[in-house]
């Protein structure tokens, strides 16, 4: 029986989780893996670049409309065969997005259980600067077997990453690695590598800042589809391979605020 990788990618809002998740999904699918991406952000944009700019109905929106949701209503095939799902979020100012994720995932499992089992890699793109009770649901409910944190080398993204590590440890979830999505900060790779080591984990990849990523997104494409020969596409391919073969999991420690500030000076 094949070993299925089910990963959650956490990180500060705006750090590039959706971009990273969608490009890694595309890279792994190009390599012949069966891949599904499940967007858990109320913005519902995790899969948009895999679908050439098309927004898809979210599970929670359809449930609110009283639709008898079926697999064909919420699972769409994107670039390279990636299966795309958006959980959606609550109406603005009403309800908890984290609890909504639980409802959406449970619905998906009930209508697409066989499809979920067929996947080699499932990526949950999870929002939030902290791991609250709701957003940690994919982990706590056993839907996820690996967690990664995405950050850059600046203080605030590292502060968020540090809090996420603290939250994961509190619920007994090991961390599988740290990913640096560069903002072109000074000594960025060195800082994030040091952070990874000091919390007991590993730096999985350093993703350099490239304008082509934003250019592709504006046109509704992933880098893997629009610019497959770019250097950044190769970075995503290597990160995908690393995630697929990674076996390291540690109960991450967290750093003091003083240490974070010292590290990012």
Curated annotation (Swiss-Prot):
CDD domains xrefs: NifH (cd02040)
Catalytic activity: Ni-sirohydrochlorin a,c-diamide + 3 AH2 + ATP + H2O = 15,17(3)-seco-F430-17(3)-acid + 3 A + ADP + phosphate
GO molecular function: ATP binding; iron-sulfur cluster binding; ligase activity; metal ion binding; oxidoreductase activity
Cofactor(s) listed: [4Fe-4S] cluster
Keyword match Lipid biosynthesis: no
EC number: 6.3.3.7
Enzyme's top EC category: ligase
Disulphide-bonded residues: none
Superkingdom of the source species: Archaea
UniProt keywords, alphabetically: ATP-binding, Iron, Iron-sulfur, Ligase, Metal-binding, Methanogenesis, Nucleotide-binding
Pfam families hit by this protein: Fer4_NifH
GO biological process: methanogenesis
InterPro entries cross-referenced by the UniProt entry: NifH/chlL_CS (IPR030655), NifH/frxC (IPR000392), P-loop_NTPase (IPR027417)
Protein family membership: Belongs to the NifH/BchL/ChlL family.
Role of this protein: Involved in the biosynthesis of the unique nickel-containing tetrapyrrole coenzyme F430, the prosthetic group of methyl-coenzyme M reductase (MCR), which plays a key role in methanogenesis and anaerobic methane oxidation. Catalyzes both the six-electron reduction of the tetrahydroporphyrin ring system and the gamma-lactamization of the c-acetamide side chain of Ni-sirohydrochlorin a,c-diamide to yield 15,17(3)-seco-F430-17(3)-acid (seco-F430), the last intermediate in the biosynthesis of the coenzyme F430.
Subunit relationships: Homodimer. The Ni-sirohydrochlorin a,c-diamide reductive cyclase complex is composed of a NifH homolog component CfbC and a NifD homolog component CfbD.
The protein, known as: Ni-sirohydrochlorin a,c-diamide reductive cyclase complex, component CfbC
Species annotation: Methanosarcina acetivorans (strain ATCC 35395 / DSM 2834 / JCM 12185 / C2A)
